[in-house]
Regions:
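Binuclear metal-dependent phosphoesterase catalytic core
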Residues: 2, 112, 201-202, 207-220, ...
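Active-site neighborhood of phospho(di)ester-bond hydrolases with catalytic His/Asp-centered motifs
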Residues: 7-9, 38-43, 68-73, 104-108, ...
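Active-site environment of divalent metal-dependent phosphoester hydrolases
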Residues: 12-19, 45-51, 74-84, 110-112, ...
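Short amphipathic alpha-helices and their capping/turn segments at secondary-structure boundaries
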Residues: 24-31, 54-61, 102-115, 160-174
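A basic- and aromatic-enriched beta-loop-alpha substructure that forms the phosphate/nucleotide-
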Residues: 66-138
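Active-site-proximal loop/helix segment associated with metal-binding centers of metalloenzymes
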Residues: 119-200
């Protein structure tokens, strides 16, 4: 089965409220049909402004057979006067898939398209104790900002989900496309002999998962978050980012044959 994918991340459309980027702004065509699949890889805007989020997705959805959202960290930011837990924001996001029939939200989940499996995850990064910690407006069930330990639990859960998907996809004979908000590699930064970043602040943006990139059934890995355009073939796996906020390429996409 063959299909086409367009992808982008880090639109941060809250900056344009009440407007948002047009199809002409995002893609190299404004034809009635742009591609089979569009993957939005996080930091589109906040789930707390769910009506604005929905309006943007409803605008985009007719141009694609399938629209996939992989949440980012900013989806869970609470910048208003009211605190919302991550669980509450996840519940709010379910109204999107209820009202937009060709929309899938993938966070530690996958969808099969013929013999290809698409796995999506925020893929929160691991924050070692050597990395300075900064509290973000993301809240747990007690309406307290997430701790370092809670971030690392999210990282562990995402990594386990991805590893299980890679393993199961091999059993099922599926080629795998991975879409994660956080980067799976420190490759765009200066690293040591263990592929670990020399600047510990970069742990806020990336994971050291080059071993998973190298899995033979992982064919494409798309990511966001770093605001750094990136395109590289790593041992046969196409690894790319396409952030709207920096160096965005309207024509960038993936053809799956």
């Amino acid at each position: 089965m063959s299909f086409t994918i367009k992808f982008c991340s880090d639109l941060h459309i809250n900056k344009y409220y009440p407007h948002f980027p047009s199809v002409k702004d995002l893609f190299d065509t404004n034809d009635k049909f742009i591609a089979d699949i569009c993957i939005l890889i996080g930091d589109i805007t906040h789930f707390e402004v769910i009506k604005f989020y929905k309006k943007f997705l409803q605008y985009l959805s007719p141009y694609f057979s399938l629209l996939i959202v992989v949440p980012g960290n900013h989806e869970y930011y609470c910048n208003g006067t009211k605190k919302h837990s991550m669980k509450e924001l996840d519940q709010a996001s379910q109204t999107l898939t209820r009202d937009i029939k060709n929309l899938e939200i993938l966070n530690n989940k996958y969808i099969d398209i013929g013999d290809v499996r698409i796995f999506g995850s925020i893929l929160w990064s691991y924050l070692p104790h050597t990395t300075p910690y900064r509290k973000l407006p993301i809240y747990n069930d007690n309406y307290e900002m997430l701790t370092r330990n809670e971030f690392n639990i999210l990282n562990y859960s995402a990594k386990m989900s991805l590893e299980n998907c890679i393993r199961q996809s091999k059993t099922d004979g599926k080629e795998l496309i991975v879409a994660t908000h956080y980067s799976p590699t420190f490759d765009m930064y200066e690293v040591d002999d263990n592929n670990e970043t020399k600047d510990h602040m970069n742990y806020w943006y990336c994971n050291n998962m080059d071993d998973l990139i190298n899995e033979d059934n992982v064919k494409v890995w798309l990511f966001g978050h770093t605001h750094t355009p990136y395109r590289k073939n790593i041992n046969g796996t196409i690894v790319m980012s396409n952030p709207y906020v920096s160096g965005y390429c309207k024509g960038l996409g993936v053809n799956i044959n």
